[in-house]
Design a protein with these regions (language model features):
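Residues that form generic nucleotide/phosphate-binding pockets
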Residues: 9, 25, 86, 114, ...
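Short, conserved beta-strand/beta-arch hydrophobic-aromatic motifs that form part
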Residues: 37-95
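Well-ordered alpha/beta subsegment
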Residues: 89-119
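N-terminal first-folded block
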Residues: 24-33
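Generic structural signal for short, solvent-exposed loop/turn connectors between secondary structure elements
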Residues: 1, 14, 59-62, 119
């Protein structure tokens, strides 16, 4: 499995553009890396800050489910309250991670800008 395979799982053209924006946005950041991950029926893009698995993007037919994971939240530069204020549609999981359904490139750009500002 590779990143192109993940993109093929998306049906919506807007969500494909959003996925591309996420991949491009993290590709250009120093200290960030990513890889496609396959686990049963749930395939994801794992995004690392140095060696910490801080973010994920899970393709869906109509959106990309973006995760801000606990290792990133523990850094203290992004907070659950801050993310929820910026994205009221975001949700907090039972594991204490923040998820957001990203359906378009504009939302992807806002999400990436928030992450970059917390670098």
């Amino acid at each position: 499995m590779n990143i192109a395979d993940l993109r093929k799982e998306i049906v919506s053209s807007d969500a494909k553009v959003a996925f591309d924006a996420i991949v491009d946005g993290f590709s250009g950041q120093v200290g960030m890396s990513m890889n496609a991950h396959e686990q049963g029926f749930l395939n994801s893009l794992r995004i690392y800050r140095d060696s910490d698995y801080c973010f994920a993007a899970v393709p869906n037919d109509e959106w990309v489910l973006a995760y801000i994971r606990k290792p990133e939240l523990r850094r203290g530069k992004l907070t659950v309250d801050g993310v929820m204020a910026a994205f009221p549609e975001a949700r907090l999981t039972n594991q204490g991670e923040v998820t957001l359904r990203i359906r378009d490139a504009g939302t992807a750009a806002r999400w990436l800008a928030m992450i970059r500002s917390a670098a």
